Amino acid sequence: MTFGIEFVPSDPVLKIAHYAKLAEQQGFDNVWITDHYNNRDVYSTLTVLAMNTNSIKLGTGVTNPYTRNAAITASSIGSLNEISGGRAILGLGPGEQATFDAMGISWEQPLTTTKESIAAIRGFLAGEKVTMDGDMIKFGGAKMAFKAGDVPIYMGAQGPKMLELAGEVSDGVLINASHPKDFEVAVKQIAAGAKKAGRDPKEVDVAAYACFSIDKDAAKAKSAAQIVVAFIVAGSPDMVLERHGIDPAAKADIGGAIAKGDFGALMGGMVTDSMMDAFSICGTPDDCKARINELLDIGVTQIVAGSPIGPNKEKAIKLIGKEIIG
């Protein structure tokens, strides 16, 4: 098993660099930085992290094939790989409708766009002249002018078709989930894609990109994660909620509270214990270890501690290092 950690660049970059250095010291393998237009730039942030760390791998968690041309993405991640001494990982997924609507970008054929973009990016990183006349991605003989080196490509994937594609074409899969029930389904879909491509499914790193909250006081850990879980519930398909025995009608109630900014209602019981169990790794070190072991038994090979990490981020990083990574 490897252990990753996610940071959102809504915080100042040097603050994130401090956390990344601490995570490296505590034995984390990977740091993942989210990519969203209203936060600090993902590649600028990762470059600062590269210059403030020595061994931890540095990934986009995740970027998308719409806001940047595939050649630009290849150049950016290749530059990061050079600066970091070969520590870059490209995490790329289809993104989501609401973000692109806000940006005025047409979100068309996400499965095809993701697949063709990965093929083009692999070509650029390999130093090839890329000529492509795909359904969505087209190049007329573009080529990078420097050697990028080997960069693993991970896919952010949720739905069955994306998970199968990840098994076909990616080195790893970042899945926003925390519960064994979700991975029982996902691991099978990834394996089906790998077998379709003639690959061993074990070649694909399966990462639980989880809402994570750890503290010696379980109640404090739970409280820190409730708002994050509320957003997860509000954005979950009915099928996923039903898998966990959660009434889909609760999604509308929680979504309404979020829209009103009524976080008191969310913290006051609207986010139930069953929701916390379904959509987070949360509690004391022993609580978190128990869930992690369940995920490893199903086929998860990387745990990513995503937001909020804990009620106190610095203490949580140290606690994970001491009590879980060991």
From Swiss-Prot:
Function: Catalyzes the reversible reduction of methylene-H(4)MPT to methyl-H(4)MPT.
NCBIfam families: F420_mer, PRK02271.1
Catalytic activity: 5-methyl-5,6,7,8-tetrahydromethanopterin + oxidized coenzyme F420-(gamma-L-Glu)(n) + H(+) = 5,10-methylenetetrahydromethanopterin + reduced coenzyme F420-(gamma-L-Glu)(n)
Protein name: 5,10-methylenetetrahydromethanopterin reductase
GO cellular component, one term: cytoplasm
HAMAP family xrefs: F420_mer (MF_01091)
UniProt KW Kinase keyword: no
Gene: mer
Family: Belongs to the mer family.
Keyword line: Cytoplasm, Methanogenesis, One-carbon metabolism, Oxidoreductase
Top EC class, one word: oxidoreductase
Lineage, opening ranks: Archaea, Methanobacteriati, Methanobacteriota, Stenosarchaea group, Methanomicrobia
